[in-house]
From Swiss-Prot:
Cited InterPro entries: ATG26_PH_GRAM1, ATG26_PH_GRAM2, EryCIII-like_C, Glycosyltransferase_28, GlycoTrans_28_N, GRAM, PH-like_dom_sf, PH_domain
UniProt name for this protein: Sterol 3-beta-glucosyltransferase
General function of this protein: Sterol glycosyltransferase responsible for the glycosylation of ergosterol to form ergosterol-glucoside. Mediates autophagic degradation of peroxisomes (pexophagy) and is involved in pathogenesis via peroxisome degradation inside appressoria that are developing into the host invasion stage.
CDD domains per UniProt: GT1_Gtf-like, PH-GRAM1_AGT26, PH-GRAM2_AGT26
Broad enzyme group: transferase
Gene3D superfamilies linked: Glycogen Phosphorylase B, Pleckstrin-homology domain (PH domain)/Phosphotyrosine-binding domain (PTB)
Length: 1475
């Protein structure tokens, strides 16, 4: 037995390593202690057996066939370095510049003497504001509502300060594309709309926050002198208004002393949309925002605003949809089939759905623009357009393509909105007009055109659809706008006259000695100059701008329902409710990856950026063209590009073009908080742009991509003092560094990126790099070079882009090494705070690994496979280990320590429930916000305005995608309007009938009328559940005896059945026809043989359902023809072809005769029936049998159909006492029961079970059902062995209750029993007898949750019992699998699949009915076979195979015959690639 994995010693909080740093002498002396141990085998490690189980010979025991192949043996010596300190390296000044660390924004208290010269009140206010700002949440996420004394009385969490957010920034003032925004802005008393939002969701709460962060920034980095001079000059002019703004903003809080006359709804709307004061609510209507989708929400019409609110939660961790699609390559037009998974904002595709850690590719839908069906004829092809490229897909059916498109549209729409709700606030004074439009046939729609703000008067359009109250709502809106328009005109005229009078009076005061004529002339000239601009009288200054979390439709959009109508605008960059933790686009990624598409935002946003620049500069900045401090997170060349694209460069701009003359932009952060990580800012220096100018081809570059955040240029005394606070002791070290590493100075001054040779040499040199080292490891000086070069943020952006991870993912370290799968593959390892990733670097390879840290169990250090390499084994929960190799032992040790620390941190956060705190709080606050609005609506007079759904849209094929306020709601409801008479036809044992009882109970709950047609002995059981019963002839006991003696449906079975059961088959067919009459839908186990013909006769939809694979696939062999060894995809596929042909040829004569005589149908054949096109429901879990890659879209793996009967079952007192005694004795408790299996010698099997239980030293609950079935006639009764006290015999017990009481289960391996034991999360021992039991035994063993016995006897069974109760690895894997199975609801999934595929099933029946009308009974018609059938020059011919098989005496079901398929068939490479 190999020693247990050795975990490295962890000390300190969250598993922080205790690392000691010394000088060169200590580094040279460090030695790692090496221990030797064997490499883990890739299969489940064997547990050392006790001596009592080692003794004994099992050579005479019964061999159970088919058996599995021999386990692969691996011998890998392991070496473990126990000293963590040995992995560290000496830290000196030079080493700090070589490594890369994330910056910290929490070093504010470490201020120099110059900072402390500020007044104590200012400094104290700064600290108070800084702490308060951390606690504030942005409105983009949610409004944390105050307690309403007049409302529901729900407890409030905390009071928000409205000024903390300046809700709803001006839409045109926001960038087209996200970017990291500088916080050094002029802090003026400006309206709430005059601040842009941050591209990464880090919106500035208000100007004072920006100034505070400005102070914070300068404390954490050492800027070059030029940059600090510019910074000081810029800060001076901001200082006076800065102080005023802070004072005023601190006083501006929402008080609950609002006017008592204000309604609860008005106060809620004030909170959510941040009005200056509560506004009277005129009307409220349920409506739908119409863009590329329909979004359900509510419109609130107040005295001054038209507001729209919709609850739209994110689904970051939820798998929205999964299934198979075909995808064409970027350069290869051929379609390849993959398994796709739409999770969160990422569409991933895999070659193997069971290995979700290795995606073949990913599509980040945060960059998505549109998704649409392109093939209008067949409706199978659709595309997804992103900023980077267009992806082409093909579905198996038109409904599947439409479902995928709608799901993708929903995700794209959600990702373009910031936060968990959509909020739009349209000031009534900004509205131009309201127009009735006929956009939808089933709803009243109005178009509202609004002026974005009073800078450029850009026009936006919003479309709202009403399924009820539409005429009334539009009428109210029109009346309101007309009244507001007339009032505004009068106010504008009065204001203009008043301003002119004030101006003349002011001139008289300034020039008292001036002759009246000259003064009058001057004033008249000045007045005429103003009079030239007509907007003075017609377009007065608007009090506020349009505010929204979602980009509007452009007024120049050719079609409001264009796929790009809402996506042309960038992500939610118009988001005035900007979130602090943005989980969307990142500017640097846009700049690098999609520069050619940067002009997609159009010129309007470019103008709005210029407006914002001019607006923010204010009167103090208009005359200045001096440079402003620039801080960029981009490559050095980007800053210069922006400057040159706007104007001729001045000297100051030339200096700004190089990052060495800029403020460092990164601060190392020891915190994983996204709020701190995203304080990476950039500033864009430009001269004041002309109002409403168009930048042409630089629209996105000069406009939406740039912040335009200008700084005043007048220096202040405080900032000049700060400038001199540069620690002189650091200057010498910096100079030494420049002398010793002069080659790197060029990279700091130059604007071009790293060369190809430098990149490649660094890649092959290997090594490691840390991005988030603890503060005790690196000093404050270390981030100087890193920040100046700007590499940290770039590395994090590239890491997230490589693996399509959210922006909350924070890179911690990278390593170069090899991953070992088939051959060593060189690549790069990434460790973040939530994931462990790998990316191959060899040309021609695209291997990626994305492994969540929560799925990793442990990390072991071993010797490598190759000489001189050091190995690392990542042990994954419920998955095989993954092996890595490193060229250097210290790199391997560093990787192990970092990964173990991250694991400990993750486990600790998960334990205290703090792993996803931010996301959870966002969701809870959004729900509270939604509930508060709902409650306020109910108390108003608008409670009768309920949502009316457009039910007629179900028949509109081109209706837009619909998003519901309820995240679980869906318009994709295929439920039939009328209840159906559904018949389930099956034969076999109790395990074959039980799943149908569970399904029928679900159908009963849906309002349908189910019926089960099966053997008569199950009548009472079925009717006991309130289900109708219909009898089908046949004796399941005799059928089981035939299967055990001859194998299940083997040639020997069919040959004997033909000789002995001809009458039985005729009776089965006739009784099945009688039992199914009057049905509207037929669901059949294919072993019943009659259903497909009955459905054809009745012209009703037909489904198949079974407990084991019956559909042709290369992934698994047919469950009735399991080989002794794994034979590969070609053999697996041929087992289905062979079985279909043998099974049909053995019964074709009787079936066709029955069709002619009873059903009055012509003869048929396999080609005409096309059984593999029938929709199929598999009632097992995808976690047990992963859906094969070559399953068609109509083949569904729904999950187990469990019939839980244990809730009302009362266990006998003897049983509960036995269980309690076993627990008291601290003995393992197992269940042994082989169901209703027929055995030749019941006494012998019982004695073997007794001996095995005693040898394994366990307690056993025995269900001895095998002795209760029929035996051979004429045999004398044999005395049964006496049961020892360690065994308690029961007649029966519900599996769901019993398996929850025990430690392991041993049974025959039937599908239902296997599912029950796996759902309980306990190891499973399978002793297969016949049929699918061998298949499920192999699956249980393959996934590592149990044992499939190869031999049967007391010794083998005792060893299995002991291992199942003592193997920790197996126990943990079984527990994990149990959690996954319990999360499924197989019955509900099956019912939804029936609804979804109903039309497809009807189309098959109609097609067959049409053929029968035209075809004569004996005509041999050629029909098209399934399009997914694999055809190749090496594929065996099915007819020839059938002919050969008919000449064989028996098939692999018999124990005395060598299994079929021991010859490996030659297959083409194309066929192997599909397997």
């Amino acid at each position: 037995m190999p020693p247990p994995p050795l975990s490295l010693p962890l000390h300190g909080p969250a598993g922080a390593a205790s690392v000691t740093f010394a000088g060169d002498e200590d580094v040279k002396k460090r030695v790692g202690k090496k221990l030797q141990k064997k490499r883990h085998e890739p299969t489940t490690p064997a547990v050392e057996l006790p001596e009592r189980l080692k003794e004994g010979d099992d050579a005479g025991e019964e061999d159970l066939v088919p058996t599995q192949g021999p386990p692969m043996f691996m011998n890998m010596n392991q070496s473990i370095f126990g000293l963590i300190a040995a992995a560290g390296s000496r830290v000196d000044f030079h080493d700090r510049f070589e490594s890369s660390d994330d910056e910290s924004a929490d070093e504010g208290p470490q201020r120099d003497s110059a900072d402390r010269s500020h007044s104590s009140s200012t400094h104290g206010l700064f600290l108070h504001r800084k702490q308060r700002r951390r606690d504030e949440s942005d409105v983009a996420k949610t409004t944390v509502l105050n307690k309403d004394p007049y409302g529901s009385g729900k407890p409030e969490k905390h009071k928000r300060k409205i000024s903390g957010h300046k809700l709803l920034r001006s839409l045109p003032a926001l960038p087209r594309l996200p970017r990291h925004k500088s916080k050094k802005e002029s802090s003026k008393l400006e309206p709430p709309s005059e601040e842009a939002s941050d591209g990464s969701g880090f919106a500035q709460s208000q100007p004072v926050d920006e100034a505070e962060d400005d102070e914070d920034d300068k404390d954490h980095r050492l800027a070059p002198v030029m940059s600090r001079m510019l910074e000081a000059k810029a800060e001076m002019s901001a200082r006076p208004s800065f102080d005023v703004e802070r004072f005023s903003s601190d006083q501006l809080t929402y008080s609950e002393s609002a006017d008592s006359n204000d309604t609860a709804l008005a106060r809620r709307l004030q909170d959510i949309f941040e009005f200056d004061q509560p506004e009277a609510v005129i009307e409220e209507y349920p409506c739908w925002l119409l863009q590329s989708v329909l979004l359900q929400g509510y419109m609130y019409i107040t005295a001054k605003h038209i507001c729209f609110y919709s609850y739209l939660p994110k689904k970051a961790l939820e798998v929205v949809k999964s299934g198979y699609l075909s995808k064409s390559g970027k350069r290869n037009p051929k379609y390849n089939r993959y398994w796709f998974r739409l999770k969160g904002d990422v569409l991933s595709y895999f070659k193997d759905p069971s290995n979700v850690y290795f995606p073949s590719g990913q599509i980040d839908l945060r960059y998505g623009i549109s998704a649409s069906v392109t093939d209008k004829k067949d409706g199978l092809n659709f595309t997804v357009v992103t900023h980077h490229r267009t992806y082409h897909f093909r579905a198996d059916s038109a409904p599947s393509a439409k479902e995928w498109v709608k799901s993708l549209q929903r995700v794209i729409f959600r990702s373009h909105n910031e936060g968990d709700s959509v909020k739009i606030s349209l000031p009534i004074e900004n509205v131009i007009d309201i127009e009735d439009t006929q956009m939808l046939n089933f709803a009243d729609t109005c178009k509202i055109r609004v002026i974005d703000n009073d800078e450029t008067y850009a026009i936006d359009e919003y479309f709202f659809s009403f399924f009820s109250f539409g005429k009334e709502a539009i009428s109210v809106l029109k009346i309101l706008i007309e009244d507001a328009s007339s009032t505004a005109k009068d106010a504008a005229r009065l204001k203009a006259v008043q301003e002119e009078e004030d101006r003349q009076q002011q001139q008289q005061q300034q020039h008292p000695m001036q002759p009246p004529m000259q003064a009058s002339a001057r004033s008249s000239m000045s007045g005429s100059r103003r009079a030239i601009a007509p907007p003075k009288l017609t377009t007065n200054k608007l009090p506020e701008a349009v505010k929204a979390t979602l980009s509007p439709m452009s007024a120049h959009s050719p079609s409001a329902l264009s796929p790009r109508a809402s996506m042309d605008a960038a992500r939610a960059s118009f988001d005035a409710f900007r979130s602090f933790r943005r989980r969307s686009l990142d500017l640097s990624t846009i700049i690098r990856d999609s520069s050619p598409r940067r002009s997609f935002s159009g010129n309007r946003r470019s103008m709005s950026r210029n407006r914002l620049d001019d607006q923010r500069r204010g009167p103090h900045q208009q005359g200045s063209t001096d440079s402003y401090v620039q801080s960029s997170m981009e490559e050095p060349s980007f800053s210069g590009m922006v400057a040159s694209s706007i104007e001729d460069p001045s000297a100051s701009q030339i200096l700004r073009g190089s990052d060495v003359f800029q403020n460092p932009t990164m601060r190392r952060s020891g915190s994983a908080s996204r709020t701190e990580v995203e304080k990476q800012q950039r500033r864009d220096p430009r001269s004041p742009p002309t109002l409403a100018t168009y930048s042409g081809q630089h629209a996105a570059t000069a406009g939406s991509l740039n912040d335009g955040d200008k700084q005043p240029v007048t220096p202040t005394l405080q900032s000049i003092t700060k400038m001199g606070a540069f620690p002189l002791q650091r200057v010498g070290a910096f100079a030494e560094y420049l002398n010793n590493t002069s080659s790197k100075l060029g990279s700091m001054l130059a604007t071009e990126s790293m060369g190809y040779v430098e990149k490649v040499s660094g890649m092959w040199r290997g090594g490691r790099k840390h991005y988030d080292a603890p503060p005790e490891i690196k000093t404050d000086d270390e981030d100087l070079y890193e920040d100046a070069e700007g590499k940290i943020q770039t590395s994090m952006d590239r890491f997230r882009a490589h693996f399509a991870l959210p922006e909350t993912e924070k890179l911690q370290a990278t390593y170069f090494g090899h991953i070992l799968r088939v051959l060593p593959l060189y690549g790069k390892i990434y460790i973040s705070d939530k994931s462990f990733c790998f990316r191959s670097l060899l040309p021609g390879t695209r291997t990626k690994l994305i492994l969540p840290l929560k799925d990793i169990e442990n990390v072991d250090k071993e010797k490598g496979f190759r000489f001189g390499y050091s190995g690392l084994v990542v042990v994954i929960r419920g998955h095989e280990e993954i092996f890595f190799e490193f060229g250097q032992a210290e790199v391997r040790d560093d990787c192990a320590v970092t990964l173990l620390q991250s694991l400990e941190t993750t486990r600790y956060l998960e334990k205290i429930g703090d792993l996803d705190t931010e996301e959870r709080e966002d969701e809870e606050n959004a729900m509270a916000e939604r509930d508060a609005l709902k409650e306020a609506r109910q108390t108003e007079e608008f409670h009768d305005h309920d949502v009316h759904l457009p039910k007629e849209t179900s028949g509109v094929s081109d209706a837009p995608t619909i998003l519901f306020d309820d995240p679980k709601a869906s318009f994709l409801n295929f439920k039939p309007p009328q209840p159906l008479k559904i018949t389930c036809l099956t034969i076999g044992s109790r395990g074959d009938v039980q799943p149908y009882i569970a399904l029928c109970k679900g159908l009963l709950a849906e309002g349908h009328k189910p019926r089960i047609a099966t053997h008569g002995e199950f009548k009472d059981w079925i009717e006991g559940h309130g289900i109708e019963f219909a009898k089908v002839e046949g004796d399941p006991g005799e059928l089981m005896r035939l299967c055990i003696e001859n194998g299940t449906f083997t040639w020997a079975f069919l040959r004997e059945a033909n000789s002995m059961f001809r009458g039985w088959l005729d009776e089965l067919l006739v009784s099945a026809w009688e039992a199914c009459k009057g049905s509207d839908l037929l669901i059949e186990s294919p072993s019943a043989m009659a259903g497909i013909h009955i459905a054809e006769k009745l012209s009703i939809p037909y489904f198949r359902a079974f407990t084991m694979p019956w559909t042709r696939t290369r992934a698994y062999p047919h469950a009735f023809i399991m080989p002794e060894y794994k034979m590969g995809g070609a053999y697996n596929y041929m087992t289905y072809v062979m079985f279909d042909n043998v099974f049909w040829k053995a019964t074709a004569h009787q079936v066709n005769r029955w069709r002619n005589n009873t059903l009055k149908l012509p003869n048929t054949s396999l080609e005409k029936m096309q059984p593999n096109k029938v929709p199929f429901l598999y009632n097992f879990s995808e976690y047990v049998v992963a859906p094969p890659l070559d399953f068609s879209d109509w083949i569904r793996v729904t999950g187990y159909w469990f019939l839980d009967e244990g809730s009302d079952w009362v266990p006998p007192q003897e049983l509960t006492d036995f269980i309690a005694k076993a627990r008291a004795d601290e003995k393992k408790l197992v269940y042994v029961g082989f169901g209703s299996i027929i055995v030749n010698d019941t006494a012998k099997m019982t004695q073997e079970v007794i001996d095995a239980v005693l040898k394994a030293d366990v307690r056993c609950i025995l269900s001895k059902g095998w002795s209760d079935r029929m035996g051979k006639q004429g045999e004398e009764a044999v005395d049964q062995p006496v049961m020892p006290p360690e065994i308690h015999v029961i007649k029966s017990a519900p599996h769901d209750w019993l398996f929850s009481q025990i430690d392991a289960a041993a049974h025959h391996g039937g599908s239902g029993t296997t599912g029950a034991s796996l759902r309980a999360g306990i190891p499973t021992i399978i002793r297969p007898f016949f049929g699918d039991q061998f298949f499920f035994g192999s699956r249980v063993e393959d996934i590592g949750v149990g044992i499939c016995l190869k031999k049967w006897g007391a010794i083998s069974f005792a060893r299995a019992l002991w291992e199942a109760t003592h193997n920790d690895r197996m126990i943990v894997k079984a527990r994990v699998l149990g959690e996954q199975i319990r999360s499924e609801n197989g019955v509900d999934s099956a019912i939804q699949c029936i609804y979804r595929d109903m039309e497809y099933a009807k189309s098959l029946i109609k097609r067959k009915a049409g053929k029968n009308i035209q075809v004569e009974p004996d005509e041999d018609e050629e029909s098209a076979e399934e399009s997914w059938t694999f055809i190749g020059n090496d594929e065996p011919d099915p007819d020839m195979t059938t002919k050969k098989l008919s000449e064989m005496p028996t098939l692999p079901g018999s124990s005395d015959t060598k299994p079929l398929g021991t010859r490996i068939m030659r297959v083409s490479p194309s066929q192997q690639s599909v397997a």
